[in-house]
């Protein structure tokens, strides 16, 4: 079959021998390069690709019901590969829930080890509590130091840094199933973390790797990851010659290039790797996917005397009086200080992915530390805050939009939430929360605008036992009022790392305001006008008085 676009011919594998035989008659006018016998064997082998043949009823019902169609296919793919696979879906497509579905299917092989960057360890436990409610909470253990013990835990979660330091313990403790999150952390086979990962994977029956950036353009970096799930894959030299444009140089063989990439992608999909990009599944995705990221509590010092006193004051005072306002504002400022280290740790891990993102914060100290972190990695970024002149904003936005190496936009929540377009990114990170959900929605829409071709991932970085606990509830209270009117900001977020998947309607302030300004014989006009003013304030203002709004009456009418 001819493909006019690519100017290539496609033949069925069963016709391979006949094709080679007939082409051989054209020598020497035609040069023929046969497929290596090991590759031929892979393609000729019968492979079950019938996803409908997989019975998912043994997986927790909550998880199965939360799967989008393409995620269900991902779970089935992993099961058809006997729980040894690489899920390489693009960022924001829900690799976590797919991995949990696969390993829960094989829970008889547990204990399960989950290895991830330190900044997202607690996202995993939150996802387990949400999507696998049948798993008792005491089954889950965060392994936080090399001297820690596994005990009777059925699910152990640790960072890559701990993995390499705990190798002696891991050699003695067999995990039947392993998940390596952000597996591009294992691209170098000689690194200490990769050596430890190899030890763990060699003992496990089920191994699932997750990576939104699987280095398909740099196949050399992918080889070790493939070997973790397929230990009888091609030898490295054979792989390097075929797919890394291997050449013999001055200092020996070099495998820094890429070759036969279309063949490699077909081979990997047949063997162990499934990858979907947003454009392929866009019809199944909401326009915005929101998720909560629980920051590493080990990096957040909430036990100081100062934080305890402020937290007690917030608990004691009502938000309807000035004392309560002052206490919460002070708590908000202190939270910025104590969560900054954890925020920067998360930013460090995001930079590993080499993809563009926006990060919003409110306090200058947080913005400054984020910028220092990015600079320390020699990554190009822009910053827009209250001190940025209007003409300079456009210049900086153009840099972010047009220059591929400019990966991060560091933005002030209040100063950069309107009037700019940054659609080159598909991820928005809120390092801090804010009183007004309307402001956050406006900030999100710097990416989610006309010209954005994909679904946008929105992440909220939450520090437990800080002002975030109160601010999140405060935001939800305000949003519940709007949602009851059927005209909310669509800010629904699951209590986990995986966003609530569903159809979303873009927020529309004009519709909301017109709803409340319509005449109604059932409403007292004076009281109604007062509530209209409250709604204006709710959506538009961002001063300290926002937290004093009395929404009870409005709530009842809605």
Feature roles, as predicted:
Residues 279-380:
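Conserved helicase/translocase motor-coupling segment
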Residues 98, 109-130, 216-221, 362-365:
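Conserved Walker A/P-loop ATP-binding site and its immediately adjacent core
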Residues 435-516:
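A conserved SF2-helicase RecA2
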Residues 356-360, 368-369, 375-416:
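Conserved helicase ATPase core of P-loop NTP-dependent helicases/translocases
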Residues 108-111, 177, 185, 194-279, ...:
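Conserved P-loop NTPase motor "coupling/switch" region that bridges the ATPase
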Residues 1-85, 126, 130-138, 151-156, ...:
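Charged, low-complexity
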Residues 82-102:
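Walker A/P-loop
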Residues 120-143, 229-233, 378:
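Conserved helix-turn-beta segment of the N-terminal RecA-like "Helicase ATP-binding" lobe
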């Amino acid at each position: 079959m001819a493909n006019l676009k690519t100017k290539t011919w496609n033949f069925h594998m069963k016709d391979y021998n006949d094709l080679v035989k007939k082409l051989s008659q054209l020598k020497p006018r035609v040069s023929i390069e046969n497929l290596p016998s090991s590759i031929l064997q892979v393609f000729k082998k019968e492979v079950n690709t019938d996803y409908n043949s997989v019975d998912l009823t043994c997986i927790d019902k909550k998880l199965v019901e939360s799967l989008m169609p393409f995620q269900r296919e991902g779970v089935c793919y992993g099961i058809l590969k006997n729980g040894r696979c690489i899920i390489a879906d693009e960022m924001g497509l829900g690799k976590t829930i797919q991995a949990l579905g696969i390993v829960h299917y094989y829970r008889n092989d547990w204990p399960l080890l989950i290895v991830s960057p330190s900044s997202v360890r607690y996202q995993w436990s939150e996802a387990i509590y949400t999507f696998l409610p049948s798993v008792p909470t005491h089954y889950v253990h965060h392994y936080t130091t090399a001297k820690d013990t596994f005990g009777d835990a059925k699910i152990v979660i640790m960072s890559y840094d701990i993995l390499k330091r705990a190798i002696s313990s891991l050699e003695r403790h067999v995990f039947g199933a392993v998940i390596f999150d952000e597996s591009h952390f294992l691209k170098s086979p000689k690194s200490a973390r990769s050596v430890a990962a190899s030890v763990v994977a060699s003992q496990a029956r089920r191994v699932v790797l997750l990576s939104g950036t699987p280095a398909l353009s740099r196949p050399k970096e992918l080889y070790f990851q493939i070997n973790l799930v397929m230990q009888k894959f091609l030898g490295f030299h054979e792989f390097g010659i075929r797919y890394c444009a291997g050449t013999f140089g001055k200092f020996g063989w070099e495998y820094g290039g890429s070759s036969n990439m279309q063949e490699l992608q077909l081979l990997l999909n047949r063997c162990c790797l499934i990858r979907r990009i947003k454009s392929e599944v866009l019809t199944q995705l909401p326009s915005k996917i929101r998720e909560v990221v629980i920051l590493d509590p080990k990096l957040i010092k909430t036990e100081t005397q100062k934080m305890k006193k402020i937290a007690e004051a917030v608990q004691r005072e009502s938000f309807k009086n000035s004392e309560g306002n002052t206490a919460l504002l002070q708590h908000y400022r202190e939270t910025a200080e104590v969560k900054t280290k954890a925020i920067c740790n998360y930013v460090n891990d995001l930079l590993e992915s080499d993809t563009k993102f926006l990060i919003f914060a409110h306090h200058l100290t947080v913005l400054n530390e984020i910028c220092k972190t990015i600079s320390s990695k020699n990554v190009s970024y822009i910053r827009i805050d209250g001190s940025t002149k209007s003409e300079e904003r456009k210049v900086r936005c153009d840099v972010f939009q047009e220059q591929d190496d400019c990966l991060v936009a560091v933005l002030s929540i209040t100063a950069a939430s309107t009037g700019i377009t940054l659609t080159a990114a598909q991820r928005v990170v809120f390092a801090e929360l804010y009183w007004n959900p309307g402001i956050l929605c406006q900030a999100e829409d710097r990416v989610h605008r006309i010209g954005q071709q994909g679904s946008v991932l929105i992440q909220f970085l939450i520090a437990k036992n800080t002002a975030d606990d109160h601010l999140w509830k405060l935001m939800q209270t305000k949003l519940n009022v709007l949602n009851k009117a059927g005209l909310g900001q669509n800010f629904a977020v699951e209590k986990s790392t995986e966003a609530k998947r569903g159809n979303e309607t873009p927020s529309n302030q004009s519709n909301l305001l017109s709803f409340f300004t319509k005449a109604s014989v059932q409403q007292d006009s004076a009281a109604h006008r007062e509530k209209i003013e409250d709604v204006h304030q709710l959506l538009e203002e961002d001063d300290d008085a926002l937290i004093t709004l009395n929404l009870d009456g409005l709530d009842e009418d809605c």
